[in-house]
Amino acid sequence: MPDWVLAIILGVVEGLTEFIPVSSTGHILLLGHFLGFHSTGKVFEVMIQLGAILAVISVYFGRLWSVATHLHTDPAARRFVASIVLAFLPAGFAGFLLHDYIKAVLFETPAVICVSLILGGFALLAVDRIQREPVYTDAGAFPLKTAFIIGLFQCLALIPGVSRSGATVAGALLMRCDKRSAAEFSFFLAMPTMAGAFTVDLAKNYKLLSADDAGIIALGFVCALVAAIITVRKVVDFVGRHGFAPFAWWRIAVGALGLLGLAFIG
């Protein structure tokens, strides 16, 4: 299969899965393993994530701009920013310290990804079925303690296959946030988290950048951006109607198929 076709596939998969609780990293790594995509290696995976980051900024630009311009006068805007920063810190700190181990060991073990997808799917099913009356319905007004605990849950996503979105959504639901606000807070938290991961990965892999790969990277980036914009615009309403169970079953199916593929194909 030509590299440009694989770049389109991986870019679309990145965009579609980054902001739903199915683990974009798990999907990208498994696809890369089975499809044999090695043209740009780690650099490609890093660069297409930037497309997903820009998608959130694009969709929520008006809201983010309002927060930024009222930061000096509006206590609610300052608390929202503080909640995102506080939620980011645990995974940001742990990810920085464990980056090399995670990339060298966990990211190179497809079986770990498959098992994480399956276990995370069952965990998401359990959390989704908890019938507790939501206390918090506005992602911009979560208490700081709630935001920090959601951030602790995000640390679980350092294990590939767990899903950053899945971990933060599960944490938010357990803290009695409603499903729509849990999804939105996960979007906002994704921006500093993914930007931090992007910066660290790029700093460690920039020497691998090559002008020969620019076209493939650009193609994957654009596909990820467009797919992520569509996903971010649709997923909150979908979650409000259907909950997170469809994503949980998808995770379980992908993880099981991945294990079968590893057993019979390698």
From Swiss-Prot:
Enzyme class: hydrolase
Keywords associated with the record: Antibiotic resistance, Cell inner membrane, Cell membrane, Cell shape, Cell wall biogenesis/degradation, Hydrolase, Membrane, Peptidoglycan synthesis, Transmembrane, Transmembrane helix
Enzyme Commission code: 3.6.1.27
Signal peptide per UniProt: none
Transmembrane segments: 4-24, 41-61, 80-100, 105-125, 139-159, 182-202, 212-232, 245-265
InterPro entries: UppP
A GO molecular-function annotation: undecaprenyl-diphosphatase activity
One GO cellular component term: plasma membrane
Pfam family, one: BacA
Origin superkingdom: Bacteria
Subcellular location: Cell inner membrane
Record-level GO BP terms: cell wall organization; peptidoglycan biosynthetic process; regulation of cell shape; response to antibiotic
PANTHER family reported for this sequence: UNDECAPRENYL-DIPHOSPHATASE
Function, in words: Catalyzes the dephosphorylation of undecaprenyl diphosphate (UPP). Confers resistance to bacitracin.
Name assigned to this protein: Undecaprenyl-diphosphatase
Organism: Phenylobacterium zucineum (strain HLK1)
